[in-house]
UniProtKB/Swiss-Prot annotation:
Upper lineage: Eukaryota, Metazoa, Ecdysozoa, Arthropoda, Hexapoda
Species per Swiss-Prot/TrEMBL record: Trichoplusia ni (Cabbage looper)
Protein name: Ferritin heavy chain
Reaction(s) catalysed (UniProt annotation): 4 Fe(2+) + O2 + 4 H(+) = 4 Fe(3+) + 2 H2O
Pfam families: Ferritin
GO molecular function terms noted in the UniProt entry: ferric iron binding; ferrous iron binding; ferroxidase activity
Domain Ferritin-like diiron positions: 35-191
Length: 211
């Protein structure tokens, strides 16, 4: 009996101090002088993040479409799944930038309010490539609008963000648009000459397979 009481007392001795020493961290006040991004610039960046996530979801839908057994175009599927990953990475880069500038300390959930893909099927590869090119053009225009909002602010010209978007994002966008336009042109020429077989050949070339 005494041994049971000793064990019980030992448990209490361990548990009570543990509950008494729980870590309660009070909020701290940090100077805000270093947070210099203005509202119009910040809001346009948040909208751009949503657009990048939306583009990623649309590319996922495109990849899923070309992965269907009744479509079976693995080259196109891989192309669009890779594009989805790139758009997601763009969104992550923008989020990381805002965090570096002291933003996104609250109301992060609004960034997740993204509309679902507008389309889920395409007649063929040409239509899908042209849709992708149109979507990338819209993303490029949106980035230019962000640059304008952050550059033309009468109170604060955000040179650093403008330089970041111009150097890292716009160049990649322009190269991506040119690549999609070239792919669409090549596919159209193949299909003009070989009809449906042309799309099959092009799909294999996307996988690096010579036919």
């Amino acid at each position: 009996m005494n041994s049971i009481l000793l064990v019980f007392a030992g448990i209490l001795a361990v548990c009570l101090p543990a509950s008494a020493t729980q870590c309660n961290v009070n909020p701290v006040q940090i100077p805000k002088d270093w947070i210099t991004m203005h509202r119009s610039c910040r809001n346009s960046m948040r909208q751009q993040i949503q657009m990048e996530v939306g583009a990623s979801l649309q590319y996922l839908a495109m990849g899923a479409h070309f992965s269907k057994d009744v479509v079976n175009r693995p080259g196109f599927a891989q192309l669009f799944f890779d594009a989805a990953s790139e758009e997601r990475e763009h969104a992550m880069k923008l989020i990381e930038y805002l965090l570096m500038r002291g933003e996104l300390t609250n109301d992060v959930s609004s960034l997740l309010q993204v509309r679902p893909p507008t389309r889920s099927s395409w007649k063929g590869g040409v239509e899908a490539l042209e849709h992708a090119l149109s979507m990338e053009s819209d993303v490029t225009k949106s980035i230019r609008n962000v640059i304008k909002a952050c550059e033309d602010d009468s109170e604060f010209n955000d040179y650093h963000l403008v330089d970041y978007l111009t150097g890292d994002f716009l160049e990649e966008q322009y190269k991506g648009q040119r690549d999609l336009a070239g792919k669409a042109s090549t596919l159209k020429k193949l299909m003009d000459r070989h009809e449906a077989l042309g799309e099959f050949i092009f799909d294999k070339k996307l996988l690096g397979i010579d036919v």
